[in-house]
């Protein structure tokens, strides 16, 4: 067939992209991936996402599509929905959102009108952009009111949150965060929502895998709506989901997702979600999640013992947040040095941070990805020691190129290679 290149390997058809894929595979497998929103998916998830379902366009929902030829993708989506509901014990689920951010926006579209009041955690306290931050559409369409953590403990103060809610009478209250390492009292949030007649949204994007593994409180039974990403601790493909136990809310959500904000669903991603949900129901996944908690707590303990200010004093999740202000360092500088040394994390705002978002006063470290690669407590204790070496050396004015090179050599002894190189390019 003239011009058809469907059977040509990417290394032949597009050497530039093939080189990029190979380089990224090498990067992932020669450094420690400590970004809390990242993980390593299984070969099965990769295979589903890179499957022939990429070729199929499907608008609507199973049994009610606008295009023909959807019988098999209907099976994939139905499996994903059924497995997600079973995994979290909810009645209704939508697996079509392309991302967690879009899932949140679709909830707003379903339940709110422009100008309504939304109460969510501030960015520097650990909240997410989509919870009402000024630059985000959630902060532009709605009257966004933030709540903060306590200055003395950096923990949520449910009494203060209730006071704010009683004063501003929000239409929606959001619980959930991108850098809050402790447990969230979903029951208390629902009680506040009921007092002011608000909807309660739990965004569990970071915690969903921990919840599925029984290591973090569940919002189900309290939240009117629950959103999540499917990567991070859930260890699936990048994407979003929306869940509820309320049939009327479910109907509104369906319309908000399609045709409200999306057209065709990404069927290859939905199939990969189904695979990940099944994996998350296995006994091995519970063991994995338990190990995440052991590892992150070990990391936090080493950092705190070594003199770093660990936000909230520890962690109940996969993430550890470090406040660097007492060291006179910025998150940008420390995270950049750590990356050169082979420890990849991210700069992060800390409570009541006055630095710009692209500078920040802290870093965030996550345990999910490296736990997937088999690292255990002793390895995370070593990682903590290496982080301390970088920070202490920066404060001492040492030659960081020498220090970083030495740390990278030690990192090489910790890295466990994920053996799906045949799928890398």
Curated annotation (Swiss-Prot):
<dbReference type="GO" id="GO:0030170">
    <property type="term" value="F:pyridoxal phosphate binding"/>
</dbReference>
<dbReference type="InterPro" id="IPR015424">
    <property type="entry name" value="PyrdxlP-dep_Trfase"/>
</dbReference>
<dbReference type="InterPro" id="IPR039429">
    <property type="entry name" value="SHMT-like_dom"/>
</dbReference>
<dbReference type="GO" id="GO:0035999">
    <property type="term" value="P:tetrahydrofolate interconversion"/>
</dbReference>
<dbReference type="GO" id="GO:0005829">
    <property type="term" value="C:cytosol"/>
</dbReference>
<keyword id="KW-0963">Cytoplasm</keyword>
<dbReference type="GO" id="GO:0004372">
    <property type="term" value="F:glycine hydroxymethyltransferase activity"/>
</dbReference>
<keyword id="KW-0554">One-carbon metabolism</keyword>
<dbReference type="InterPro" id="IPR015421">
    <property type="entry name" value="PyrdxlP-dep_Trfase_major"/>
</dbReference>
<comment type="pathway">
    <text>Amino-acid biosynthesis; glycine biosynthesis; glycine from L-serine: step 1/1.</text>
</comment>
<dbReference type="InterPro" id="IPR049943">
    <property type="entry name" value="Ser_HO-MeTrfase-like"/>
</dbReference>
<comment type="similarity">
    <text>Belongs to the SHMT family.</text>
</comment>
<comment type="function">
    <text>Catalyzes the reversible interconversion of serine and glycine with tetrahydrofolate (THF) serving as the one-carbon carrier. This reaction serves as the major source of one-carbon groups required for the biosynthesis of purines, thymidylate, methionine, and other important biomolecules. Also exhibits THF-independent aldolase activity toward beta-hydroxyamino acids, producing glycine and aldehydes, via a retro-aldol mechanism.</text>
</comment>
<feature type="site" description="Plays an important role in substrate specificity">
    <location>
        <position position="231"/>
    </location>
</feature>
<dbReference type="InterPro" id="IPR001085">
    <property type="entry name" value="Ser_HO-MeTrfase"/>
</dbReference>
<keyword id="KW-0663">Pyridoxal phosphate</keyword>
<keyword id="KW-0028">Amino-acid biosynthesis</keyword>
<feature type="binding site">
    <location>
        <begin position="127"/>
        <end position="129"/>
    </location>
    <ligand>
        <name>(6S)-5,6,7,8-tetrahydrofolate</name>
    </ligand>
</feature>
<dbReference type="InterPro" id="IPR015422">
    <property type="entry name" value="PyrdxlP-dep_Trfase_small"/>
</dbReference>
<protein>
    <recommendedName>
        <fullName>Serine hydroxymethyltransferase</fullName>
        <ecNumber>2.1.2.1</ecNumber>
    </recommendedName>
</protein>
<feature type="modified residue" description="N6-(pyridoxal phosphate)lysine">
    <location>
        <position position="232"/>
    </location>
</feature>
<comment type="pathway">
    <text>One-carbon metabolism; tetrahydrofolate interconversion.</text>
</comment>
<comment type="subunit">
    <text>Homodimer.</text>
</comment>
<dbReference type="InterPro" id="IPR019798">
    <property type="entry name" value="Ser_HO-MeTrfase_PLP_BS"/>
</dbReference>
<dbReference type="Pfam" id="PF00464">
    <property type="entry name" value="SHMT"/>
</dbReference>
<dbReference type="GO" id="GO:0019264">
    <property type="term" value="P:glycine biosynthetic process from serine"/>
</dbReference>
<feature type="binding site">
    <location>
        <position position="248"/>
    </location>
    <ligand>
        <name>(6S)-5,6,7,8-tetrahydrofolate</name>
    </ligand>
</feature>
<keyword id="KW-0808">Transferase</keyword>
<feature type="binding site">
    <location>
        <position position="123"/>
    </location>
    <ligand>
        <name>(6S)-5,6,7,8-tetrahydrofolate</name>
    </ligand>
</feature>
């Amino acid at each position: 067939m003239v011009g058809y290149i469907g059977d040509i390997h990417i290394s032949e058809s597009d050497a530039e992209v093939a080189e990029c894929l190979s380089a990224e595979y090498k990067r992932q497998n020669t450094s420690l991936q400590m970004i809390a929103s990242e993980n390593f998916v299984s070969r099965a998830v990769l295979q589903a996402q890179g499957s022939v379902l990429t070729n199929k366009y499907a608008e609507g929902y199973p049994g009610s599509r606008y295009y023909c030829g959807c019988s098999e993708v209907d099976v994939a989506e139905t499996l994903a929905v059924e497995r997600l509901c079973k995994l979290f014990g909810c009645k209704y689920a939508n697996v079509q959102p392309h991302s967690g951010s879009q899932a949140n926006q679709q909830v707003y579209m379903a339940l709110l009108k422009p100008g309504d009041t939304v109460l969510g955690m501030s960015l520097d306290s650990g909240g997410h952009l989509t919870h009402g931050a000024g630059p985000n559409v959630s902060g532009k369409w709605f009257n966004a009111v933030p709540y903060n953590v306590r200055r003395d403990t950096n923990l949520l103060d449910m009494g203060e949150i209730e006071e704010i809610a009683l004063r501003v009478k929000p239409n929606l209250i959001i619980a959930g965060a991108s850098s809050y390492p402790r447990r969230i009292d979903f029951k208390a949030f629902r009680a506040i929502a009921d007092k002011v007649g608000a909807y309660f949204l739990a965004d569990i994007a970071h915690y969903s895998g921990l919840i599925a593994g029984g290591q973090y409180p569940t919002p189900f039974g309290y939240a009117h709506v629950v959103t999540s990403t499917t990567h991070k601790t859930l260890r699936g493909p990048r994407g979003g989901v929306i869940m509820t136990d309320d049939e009327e809310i479910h109907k509104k959500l369906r319309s908000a997702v399609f045709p409200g904000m999306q057209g065709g669903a990404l069927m290859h991603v939905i199939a990969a979600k189904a695979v990940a949900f099944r994996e998350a129901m296995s006994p091995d996944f519970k063991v994995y999640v338990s190990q995440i908690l052991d590892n992150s707590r070990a990391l936090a303990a080493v950092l705190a013992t070594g003199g770093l200010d660990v936000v909230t004093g520890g962690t109940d999740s996969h993430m550890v947040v470090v406040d660097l202000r007492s060291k006179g360092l910025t998150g940008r500088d420390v995270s950049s040095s750590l990356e050169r040394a082979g420890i990849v994390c991210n700069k992060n705002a800390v409570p009541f941070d006055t630095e710009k978002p692209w500078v920040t006063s802290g870093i965030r470290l996550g345990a999910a990805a490296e736990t997937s690669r088999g690292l255990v407590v002793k390895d995370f204790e070593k990682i903590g020691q290496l982080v301390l070496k970088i920070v202490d050396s920066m404060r001492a004015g040492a030659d960081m190129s020498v220090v970083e090179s030495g740390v990278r050599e030690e990192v090489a002894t910790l890295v466990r290679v994920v053996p799906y190189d045949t799928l890398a390019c």
